[in-house]
């Protein structure tokens, strides 16, 4: 077997206290999923068991939730955007989301509205999709360096898309400024003082994928011992972990939060025990994770309940893309993009590492481990996907 060393810095969470949040409980997840189930085309995304790979890596099971199959959008993010917009409109028009369908919501809107957000690609596409479904407008801002394919995907949903010359976090501030000037509704997946309601709804919407996964694991007769969750601002990681620890308890679930080393604000916050922002270009292939300022709502859950934080180089994500796209043995093939594949990439990087055994022990990975991984996106940038998987971009160095 080849042996090579990729950067995977691991920090134990010294500030873990196991305090869960009622905002991200099982009941909140059920409410969100009940709404999503009323949207035409809803079906749970696959939970793929990579049994041959699990055997190779020395664990009992590897389960990958494949979010490339979500509503034809190639990513999970619409779960948050659509749910938040629905909640916003229900509040505005005094409607009950528990009894309302997406179609009824569309008919209830008595005015033309514009929803604005900042995105690296997937969240903005989800907001644009929801706005289009409801007959409303969307203006989507993207940071510099955004792939044209991701821009086109948003434009194809009828939204306006503006690529700035700023990084993600500065683009969020610009979006807020423009929205205030024009009277738009901001649907952003990060929070700040005075802006928490919509990000909370977004995070609750993300819990639908976790609720599906728990149901699917129960049908398989397995209970997860580990979950690897990638983080940008930490909205998905916080929302999903908040739900999972309500189901399994924080003490019984070994949760690992993974980030690119060029945008590892959650990792650095985890080391300090308080929010640490990261500035600059944050140049990483994991575009969906290139965020330097943690969502305070997500951070609180991660600080309280995450077991460990990992900061890793881009080659870890690229390795995950190649492993998922070229399955071992009889395992199913999964097309996973840069931000989607990094969790599996960590498992692969550990397997090939010269200090494999000590890393396995550090992460409590053994023959009894049942590991849940979320592939949050498919090949949302096909050109770059092929450069990585076909042409060996960001290859490992032996």
Language model regions located:
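PLP-dependent amino-acid enzyme catalytic core
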Residues: 1-398
